[in-house]
C-alpha cells in the first residue's frame, strides 16, 4: 500500500475539461481519508475549448490538457504517459465533458477510442 491515490484530470472546466466541483470533492475525500494525491493528465492539446461564461465554442484558443489541469491541482500534474500503477493504490477520474473529449473520443467519434495511456492504466 502506498497511501497515494491518482486523480486523472482532463483539463479544467465542465464543458471541455474536468468538472471542478467533482475534482475538488474527490480531492477533499482523499485528503480526509489521510491519503496523498498524485495528479496526472495527458500532455496534449485539448480537443476543443469552450468559453465558460457564454457556453460558446472558443475557436480562437489553444490549450494543453496538462497545463489546464494544473488549475485544479494548484501544483504538480504529472504527464499521464509516466503513470505507473505500482505508485498508487487507486485511480479516480472526475467527470466533466473533457473526459469524453480528451481522455477518449466518445464525444466525437462514431467509432470511439480510449486514449492509449488511459487504456494502459485501466487494463
Where are these regions (language model features)?
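Extended, subdomain-level signal for the structured scaffold at the beginning of enzyme domains
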Residues: 1-123
